[in-house]
Every structure is written in C-alpha cells, then in structure tokens.
C-alpha cells in the first residue's frame, strides 16, 4: 500500500518517493510486524487460553515437558497476522512473487490450523494423518510450482543454480522443476514442524534464515550486485526482502512470548507455515542448495527422525534415545535452554557459510 501511495504522492511532492525505496519499506515492514506482534501478543494468548487451545504433552516424551501442560498453542496466529498485515502495508502488491509467497502462507496455515484443531479436540497428539497432510501440502505445492514455472519471464527463473561455480545455471524441464520444488517446499515445511519441540528452538533459526534469504533476494534483484557476485539477475526478487523483513519482525515479536519458559507455542499453524515460507522463497530465488546449508539444523532434525524409524523397523534398535534429536540431548541431561541456544549458534554459523558461497565462485 505504501509503495503505491509513494508512486501517487511523488507527483505532488518528490519527497514522497522515499516510500518506494526497498530499504525504507523493509525497515518499515520489519518494525510494523514487530510492533503488531508484541502489542497483539497478550490479546491472542488470552484468547487462546479462553478457548482452551492448550498444548497436549505426550506421556512418552521427556518428563521435563509435563510442566508445559496447559500452555496455549496455535500462537502461529500471532506470527501470521502480523506478517500478513505488514506485508500488505509495505510490499509492492503488483509483484507476483509476493502473492505466490502469501498464497503458500495461507494454504499451509489452513493445513496447520486443522491439524492443531483436531489435536485440541481429541486432546491427543493425533491431528491430521501423515498421509492427509502430505496430500494437502502436495496440492498447494503443485499449484505453486506450476504457476512459478509457466509464469516465468526469463530463463534463470526456472533454472538450477549450482553454488561455488560462476555462471553455472542449468535449465530445468517442467517436470523436474515442479517435482524438485514440491520436494523442497513440503520437506522444508515438515522439517521446521519437527524442530518445533522446545521453547524458541524453531522461531529464531527461521528468523535468521529469513533474513539471509532476504539479502540474497535483494542482491539478485539489483543488477550491479548480481553481476558482482556472478548471480543471475531476477528483477522482481528484490521485493521479497520486504516480506523477509516482515517475517523477521513478526518472528522476533513472537519470540518475546515464546522464549523459555514459553507463554505460548506456535503450533502446527506456525511451524508448517514458516517452513513453507522459507522453502518457497528459496525456490523462487533458485538457491535450494544454499538454503539446505542454512537450514542444516532443520535437515539434521528431520534426518534423525528418518534414521530412528528406519533403524527401529529394520534392526529393532533405536539410534537415538528419542527423536527428533533435540529430545535425545534432553534425555542425555542437557538443560533445555542450552540445547536451544546451541542450535541457534549452529544455525548462525551455517548461514555465514551459506552466504560465503555467494562470493566463493
């Protein structure tokens, strides 16, 4: 909205052109989402409590989690409301990438909402079945990937960018583009969902990765920076930094209430959606491999579950005390805050390594 106002009001006074600057709108979007998130926090938390939308704690989980019983869940509503409002205010709504990301956000939020609702109604950890979630996620992913491929205006939008190599861009067929995109989008969504098991564990890595993807989006949207880094120039990608800024603001605002000991949990409406958001942005920017490096913590959490299941079904033995791996460290006696902060640190290091690939070519 403000971008449009800047365009209109510049005819009256050139000073209003500042509303069109990406940097100004990114800062504005970040601060707006942060303020909305912090101010709405108590209201949404009280609403969730009044509706008895409370976290169910599994009896076979770590005993330290019993004290979390009764903590309101579905706090992802706080993240998504502040994120969406801020994006609509500060982003260029004529940019098709913004609408793709918002569409994915809404679609995965609906899946997460119904999953949370069923868990609350049943008072168990069983919401939608795994197959139901995969089917719904696949439908949204298929629509998104198909649109991205056939709406592409330049070759790099549908190509595979190989890290560490200059100008190594591999064209992709419709099938490969859509299939790999669906894999990344669904995988990212479920990876963040698996990671969201401790207070603040998932939200700060999401914020940090979102910020890093925003920098890549800005670089690829700027011809001079893209040429300097030997990146393909995607003229529309720069606008995604405004969305990433709103993601940072809403995420930090949520962390204010989600930090240990948490006053609210994001629920599947938050974790499934945030993972999908990161995935779709990485796909649009054609930096799926770089994203995999950044999201190493999410990847390891997912692999730990896969390894545990495969090992138990084939050998009858468990590799970890409990999966995902953050529960393994809990059962080894690590304090919850120590696990959380160390995973944050690992994420920060991985992001720095991933960003280094932009120049090491």
Residue ranges and their predicted role:
Residues 42-60:
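Membrane-interface helix-loop junction between the first two transmembrane segments
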Residues 2-43, 84-96, 100-110, 144, ...:
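Alpha-helical transmembrane segments
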Residues 51-53, 123, 269:
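Juxtamembrane helix-loop transition segments at the membrane interface in multi-pass membrane proteins
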Residues 94-102, 121-136:
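Membrane-interfacial loop-to-helix junctions in multi-pass inner-membrane proteins
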Residues 110-117:
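Alpha-helical transmembrane segments within multi-pass membrane transporters and channels
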Residues 119-129, 163-172:
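Membrane interface segments of multi-pass transport proteins and intramembrane proteases
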Residues 57-71, 125-133, 326, 331:
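Juxtamembrane helix-capping/reentrant segments at transmembrane boundaries
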Residues 68-80, 132-140, 336-346:
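Select subsegments of transmembrane alpha-helices in polytopic membrane proteins
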